[in-house]
Design a protein with these regions (language model features):
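C-terminal active-site "lid" helix and adjoining low-complexity regulatory extension at the edge
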Residues: 155-180, 187-192, 201-261
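Cytochrome P450 core scaffold surrounding the K-helix E-X-X-R motif
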Residues: 54, 124-126, 219-224
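Active-site nucleotide/adenylate-binding loops and adjacent lid/helix of ATP-dependent enzymes
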Residues: 1-99
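Protein kinase-like catalytic core scaffold
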Residues: 40, 111-113, 208-210
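Phosphate-binding site of ATP-dependent enzymes
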Residues: 59-62, 66-149
Length: 261
């Protein structure tokens, strides 16, 4: 995970240790100052999607940010920025281009269902598609990008619109290691069977899990980029997952089509 400096939890400040130790604002700013960083990543700790709320600020900005958000009893994490691998910067240098890797647990095994990379465009610093300024490109098993990328409006392109870099000429560094990292982490979370991981590749070529998604995840973008990604697993998924949750109705038994009392 990215290196954390301190956290805001329910409006109170805590250092990065675990168990968390409560600190005051002066101590939090001293921790930030001690990093000698010129910029910090500030992002919501929960109920965030699509890069919403993520900000980049200097120490002065951080000092102004703290009082307001402590009063609101909100939850934030303040982290070191990720410095991505030079190859990933070749795709788009203004933001960290992350790989979405989806894993599924069936029986005792965890497998990678699909992967795509989100590439920024223009001056955007957030690579999420819902921000409307990114392109998603499918990733093959060997780390090579697919031929086409798609923006949030499903417009197709074969090269980056800013600099003309052909997608299918690019291979993601350390892609195998990134997949294995997600598999290993998923193995340690036994109560979740479907997880979407956002992974960066740092300057040393090591995978860095930026975050993982267990709530508002879907496979729409994966299927646009790579086709019906659950096809190899569909029989096992349907056989195992007996209950279908229908909004407004509740759980339906796939075997009987009768909702329980």
């Amino acid at each position: 995970l990215p290196q954390t400096i301190f956290r805001i939890i329910n409006g109170r400040l805590f250092d990065k240790s675990y168990p968390y130790r409560m600190i005051d604002a002066d101590t939090a700013l001293a921790l930030a100052r001690a990093t000698e960083l010129s910029e910090f990543v500030v992002k919501p700790a929960r109920d965030s999607s699509g890069g919403s709320g993520v900000a980049f600020m200097d120490l002065a900005g951080l000092a102004s940010f703290l009082p307001a958000h402590m009063r609101r009893h909100s939850d934030w994490v303040i982290q070191h920025p990720i410095r991505q691998h030079e190859c990933m910067s070749a795709l788009h240098a203004s933001c960290v281009n992350t790989i979405r890797i989806i894993t599924i647990r069936l029986s005792a095994e965890v497998s990678v269902v699909s992967a795509f990379v989100r590439i920024g465009t223009g001056t955007t610093r957030v690579d999420n598609l819902t921000a409307g300024k990114s392109i998603a490109v499918g990733v093959e098993q060997d780390g090579r990008l697919g031929r086409y990328g798609y923006d949030n409006d499903l417009r197709r392109c074969s090269a980056h619109p800013d600099h003309g870099y052909a997608f299918d000429s690019f291979v993601i560094p350390s892609f195998s290691a990134a997949q294995q990292t997600c598999i290993d982490l998923h193995q340690s979370i036994p109560d979740l069977d479907f997880i979407s991981w956002d992974v960066a590749i740092d300057q040393q070529g090591k995978p860095v899990v930026v975050e993982f998604n267990v709530g508002r995840q879907d496979i729409n973008t994966s299927q646009v980029c790579s086709g019906p990604v659950l096809n190899p697993y569909i029989d096992e998924v349907l056989a195992r997952d007996r209950w279908l949750i229908i909004p407004g109705i509740g759980p339906i038994d796939r075997h009987t089509d009768i909702a329980p009392d």
